[in-house]
Amino acid sequence: MAFASVLKDAEVTAALDGCKAAGSFDHKKFFKACGLSGKSTDEVKKAFAIIDQDKSGFIEEEELKLFLQNFKAGARALSDAETKAFLKAGDSDGDGKIGIDEFAAMIKG
């Protein structure tokens, strides 16, 4: 698991179980359930780097669609509606992607 150095496996499993059904993903509930919302700034930066698959310095829509799979192989992809809602929630400057500061604000929010 890519997040082994940051998150506990049991918390990740519980968070993923909470959004198994299509359309049930809620980023606030997920971040709280997996324990990310209580992590340090450095740990949040590590999480961002894992999710930023292309290392562009931003999390784009395609990376958000596969967001859950970063936590556990075989997890479902987010639906288009979930992906767009997630992007809208995190993209505070309207550039169509989520930067590290936006990601940190979303986790702590």
Swiss-Prot record:
Temperature dependence per UniProt = Highly thermostable. Not degraded by heating at 140 degrees Celsius for 20 minutes.
Q: Which residues bind Ca(2+) 2?
A: D91, D93, D95, K97, E102
Which keywords belong to this entry? Acetylation, Allergen, Calcium, Metal-binding, Muscle protein, Repeat
Effect recorded for S24A: More than 50% reduction in IgE reactivity of 4 patients sera out of 11 patients sera tested
Q: In which tissues is it expressed?
A: Expressed in both white and dark muscles (at protein level). About eight and a half times lower expression in the dark muscle than in the white muscle (at protein level).
MF GO annotations: calcium ion binding
- Classification via PROSITE patterns: EF_HAND_1, EF_HAND_2
Instruction: Give the recorded effect for H27A.
Output: More than 50% reduction in IgE reactivity of 7 patients sera out of 11 patients sera tested
The UniProt record gives the binding positions of Ca(2+) 1 as D52, D54, S56, F58, E60, E63
Q: Output the PTM entry.
A: The N-terminus is blocked.
**What residue stretches are annotated with the EF-hand domain?**
39-74, 78-109
Impact after mutating K28A? Complete loss and more than 50% reduction of IgE reactivity of 3 patients and 9 patients sera out of 11 patients sera tested, respectively
Q: PTM N-acetylalanine: at which residues?
A: A2
Q: Which Pfam families match?
A: EF-hand_7
Indicate yes or no for the key word Acetylation: yes
Its cellular-component GO annotations read:
cytoplasm
* SMART domains on file: EFh
The family database entries (CDD domains) matched by this protein are listed as:
EFh_parvalbumin_beta
Q: Name the PANTHER family for this protein.
A: PARVALBUMIN (PTHR11653:SF12), PARVALBUMIN ALPHA (PTHR11653)
The record's similarity note reads: Belongs to the parvalbumin family.
Q: What does this chain do? A: In muscle, parvalbumin is thought to be involved in relaxation after contraction. It binds two calcium ions.
Q: What is this protein called?
A: Parvalbumin beta
From what organism does this protein derive? Scomber japonicus (Chub mackerel)
Lineage of producing organism = Eukaryota, Metazoa, Chordata, Craniata, Vertebrata
